[in-house]
Amino acid sequence: MSTEKAAWFPSLHQAGEAIALVDGELSLTYTELNDAVSHVVAGLLNGEASLKEERVAFLYPASFDYAALIIGVVAAGGIAVPLSVHASAGELSHCLSVAGVRRLLLPSEMRSEALDAVCESLGVGQLAVEDLPDAQVPHALPLAGEQGALIVFTSGTTGKPKGVVHTVASVSAMVTSLIE
């Protein structure tokens, strides 16, 4: 996976067997993270060249899947919409609606009748990472610095949460500063 537009994506495969993420006793190498991200990218694109800033939400606890999803959605040209696993069905409905989401990725244990009803009413499809189709990863990823990368919802202390869009360039700058 490579792109000329966001310098932090290529480092996933360049670091090889170095540890990328640690979760308690478990660790994930950059190679393993790159493989997981590639599965997300290929599955979401499913033969298309780009998600064209499609908003793709996910409802996963902090985990390796969460990391692969946030990177994979952006790498595929989409806008990642991470949602809180502690949000109520009503709060999730608001966020999904405001963000204009059409696909929600979540593990089976996060599904509920209330969330199923919300997704059905909004026309949002639900699937898990393992349900993404196996497909080829494109050689070049469709990224440009000015395109949307991430929608983060505010806390909503004075009203309903608002979605704040971050660009590929702003996310890249943040990640680069963390790496340095």
Question: Can you name each region flagged by the protein language model?
Answer:
Residues 1, 128-148, 175:
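Flexible, low-complexity linker/hinge segments
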Residues 7-29:
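AMP-dependent adenylate-forming
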Residues 17, 136-153, 160, 165:
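Conserved pre-ATP/AMP-binding loop-to-beta segment of ANL
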Residues 26, 41-90:
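Conserved AMP-binding/adenylate-forming
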Residues 34-42, 164-180:
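Conserved structural elements of the adenylate-forming
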Residues 79, 102, 125:
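Residue-level detector of anion-binding/catalytic polar loops
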Residues 85-114, 174-180:
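Conserved ATP-dependent adenylate/AMP-binding module captured primarily in the ANL superfamily
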